[in-house]
Amino acid sequence: MTVLETENLTHYYENGMAGAVAAIENINVKFEKGEIVGIIGHTGSGKSTLLQHLNGLLKPDSGRVLLCGEDINKDKRTLRAARFRVGLCFQYPEYQLFEETVYKDISFGPKNMGLDSAEIDRRVRRAAEFVGLSEEHLKKSPFDLSGGEKRRAAIAGVMAMEPEVLILDEPTAGLDPRGREVILSLVRTYREQTGSTVI
């Protein structure tokens, strides 16, 4: 079953004197429920631009992004719902940590979803467990964590929203071989246990 797809997706960036330059043009792609998909390409080829369209952070100049057959840019309500259903973790997500504790950082997304405190707590603890963060980690400042732990805490923040689609933009960038294997292993486990699509 197709969970997320694009139809003739095109996005232009203004390039000063040169005018508009196509970052992505007429992209048609389908992502099926429960699959893991990798998107590869050279630096500047539009990978991150495409990913940012998939949860509505960028709006296409033409074309559509469909989540379970519905255009995510149809209206504000649909777009807001899509951002919770399609979780996006940016490249170097550890630079987005900002709360005073890891627990509060992971709970940020679920709180914004309007969930009650018991459900928020359940999601935070489940996401922390997925990424291998202990109760002691949850009490710490995110700035006291190692680089790999910060990365896992940031990914847990997206996982805590329990998205149908989890998008990770270069999740292993800048990590050593052991750190890369840890991240890839947790992504595989997450997909196996939740049935989510992972891009």
Q: Can you describe what each PLM-predicted range is?
A:
Residues 40-42:
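The feature captures the beta-strand-to-loop junction immediately N-terminal to the Walker
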Residues 55:
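Helix-to-loop junction immediately C-terminal to a conserved catalytic motif
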Residues 63-74, 82:
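Conserved ABC transporter NBD signature motif
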Residues 118-136:
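Conserved ABC ATPase "signature" region
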Residues 141-145, 149:
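Conserved ABC ATPase signature
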Residues 162:
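Conserved catalytic motifs of ABC-family nucleotide-binding domains
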Residues 166-169:
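Catalytic Walker B motif of ABC-type/P-loop ATPase nucleotide-binding domains
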